Amino acid sequence: WRFSACSGHFGGSMDGAALGLVEAPKTWHVAEFKTHNAKSFKALIEKGVQASKPMHYSQMQIYMHLSGMVRAYYMAVNKDDDSLYAERIHYDQPHAEALLANAASIIKANEPPEGISTNAGWYECKWCDYHSLCFEQTLPEQNCRTCLHSTPAANGLWHCEATAQMGEPPYLSADDQKQGCSMHLFIPALIKGIAVDACPDGEWVEYEQDGKTIRNKAGGTWG
């Protein structure tokens, strides 16, 4: 039950498909099963899936869109007392298409999207695992996904312009992407500074940071 979109760069696996439900016995349903704590479960009962768990709702809309099904069945269990909640969800085509368009725009973007807040103390930022990347001078991991030479290609592949210019195979395996290489240069938007200069041969990019000039050299080194 796995589906993909956006040239193989976006996808997921739904939990299952259900047929024979009392409300619509002849209609196939995307089936999703989730666990909740007591607080989350209470909100789910009071507000429904779309309002209380918009990510779960969007997940089912994507699966309905990609599978061709027009209904989803959401089953939730309260892990504190094993009580159950079920809800049938109708397919919302505009919502699903908007989600896929947003995913495609992020995949194809040359820079990461803006953060949810510029306030380091904002609660969603404060507890985020990547807080230091947004609000401190911590560098991201050095791999192909953080390198300005790589771009998404068809069939879920990634293309390296640096290796292509050297006449080597340009498409990157999953292992290649995780490891990076000696030609790595960070995407400028990931650096806490202003890009002010770059080598025409792609060997370095210079930044101004706190009144100083620093140079990101190929391979992730600095000088």
Language-model regions: role of each:
Residues 7-9, 26, 165:
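Glycine-centered tight beta-turn/hairpin loop motif at sheet-sheet or coil-to-beta transitions
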